[in-house]
Structure formats: C-alpha cells, structure tokens
Amino acid sequence: MLEAHANVIGQKPLVLSYGELVVDRVAGLDRPGGAPLNFASALQPLLRTLGGDCLVVSRLGEDAGGGLLRDALLAHNLPPTLLQTTSDDSTGISLAQIQPKGEVVFQLEPGAWDEIAWCEPLREQAAACVGLLAGSLPLRSPASASTMLALFQTSNASIRMFDLNFRHEPEAELLTSVLEAATHVKGTVEEWIQLGTILCCQADQAHAIATELRTQFALDSCLVTNGAGGCVLLDGEGAMAGLPVGFPMDENADPIGAGDHAAAGWMFALLNGRSRRDQVAAADILGAWGASQPASAPGIPPAVRDLLA
C-alpha cells in the first residue's frame, strides 16, 4: 500500500475524461473500450473513496454500439452527464489486431466521437473539475479538436493531463496548443520519440525529449511508460523510476487499455499529493493490472484499489 496522504485538492474531486468512446473489435468479438472509458473505469473506484466522481465526455450513435457503451458506463458507476448522442453518425469502432509479441495494431473507423461538441454543460463542468484527461486522438477531426482545445484552455483543473496516442499524427500547431495548456503529459517511449520528431526537438531519446518539452512548455511533470519495464517520472527534480510490478495473467489477457490504467493511477496519486515515488508506483500498479486482464476496461477490484487508496 502507498503512503497515506490527505486529498490536497479538496473534498469530492471531479475529474473529466475526454475523447473516443468506441467499440473495441478484438478477434471478431465486440467489447466496450476507448481511452476515456478505460481511464474512467479505473479511476472511479479510487475517486469514490474520496467521495469524488469521474465524468466521461464523448459522443455516441443511436445504435447497438452506443447501447453497449452506455451499459458499460452504468456497470462502472460512471454518470452519463456529459455523454452526447447523435443519429447522424454511428458509434466509433476500433479494429484491434494483437500481434504474436503482444503489440496491438489499431484501425479506428470514423465515428460519432469525431464530432464531440462544446456545450454549456461541458463548460460548467470544465470550470468545476480538479482533474482533466484527454488523449491526442480527438485532434484528428476539426470538431472534436476544437472542443478539446476549448476544454483545456478554459478548464480550472489543476491537473490537465495530455495522453499521447499517435494512431494518427496531429499537426504540430495543434499539439503545441494543447501542450501550452497542459500541466502533465504521458506517453510511451515510442510516442515521446514521435512527438519529438513532429515538434523538431533537439533531443532524440524519449527521456531527453520529455525533459526538453517539460521545460519548453512549463509542464509540471511527464511520464514515460515502457510496458512491463514500468514508468519513469520526469520533473524538476530529475528522473524517478519504480520497481517492477506484476499480477497473475489471465489466459486471455491483452495489453489494450493498460496505458489508460497507468494514467488513472498517476492522476489519483497527483490528486492526493503523493510523492514522486508513489506517483510512479500508482501508475505501475494500475498499468500492470490492466495488462493482466482480458478486457479494455476490466474494472478495479477492492484488493487492487486498496493498494492505492
């Protein structure tokens, strides 16, 4: 169990999770997924220990896929307060292929989440939240990109986390706008290197790129993830790595959603004012749990929750 600390943000913290709600199609089977759900389903049991809540911000079609995702939100006790619905577009689908060595190749079809709209309820919750997470995928379409930028630029959240996800390559100008408004950034080794290439960084290694961009954009800290190798935190005090973490692997386990779980662990540790070491440990614990399970959003059992609470 991590060291006990008081919630430094205040009572009943509210966190927003923005982006692509999709149906993950894996080996011909459909299951609820998308980074906002994966992240929120992992964070919600932890926030509830503080009386807090996580709201998913996305857009669904009026179809079977939308029903599957609505049921998943309900199962994870995630309120649909900021969930948008449309009859003009179908719910997004992510075609996932798991390679022999465990890598996952994704193909994201156009979907309703490409049209997430800025609206008054979202503006109100952006002003009220203490934490915000969004990935880079919504930057692929003008509508969802515009809403995401508005969310980052108007939110009063003290933790505005940007999660790199380069299944498509955003324009440098868009990435720069998000980084200017973000406080924390997370990505894999490969994603940091790609980000450095897009932004023409002088550095060419992941940790050095994260350090360069942390300084350039006045970020509080950055997290570099490396699968089973664990996470490295980079901030003004330098680099902090953790110890290896593992859980018994389900026979049908796959790594889809593990990075989103790591982001949830990091967010919770930040909300609680945990030490640098505990931030890395929280990310490693939830990331390892997600990787040990056969679902994108498997939920967090009490035994795992209590390791962080």
Segments and roles (model prediction):
Residues 124-125, 177-178, 215:
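Structural alpha-helical scaffold elements that stabilize or flank donor/cofactor-binding regions
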Residues 20-21, 137, 164, 261:
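Active-site metal-binding loops of divalent metal-dependent hydrolases
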Residues 1-16, 203-309:
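Conserved phosphate-binding/catalytic region of the ribokinase-like
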Residues 131, 135-208, 229-230:
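Conserved beta-alpha-beta core of the PfkB/ribokinase-like small-molecule kinase fold
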Residues 13-20, 161:
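Short, hydrophobic/glycine-enriched beta-strand segments
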Residues 12, 23-25, 48-136, 306-309:
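Conserved N-terminal subdomain of the carbohydrate kinase-like
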Residues 30-46:
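Short catalytic helix/loop segments, enriched in acidic residues and glycine
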Residues 53-54, 80, 158-160, 222:
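Hydrophobic anchor at the start of a short beta-strand
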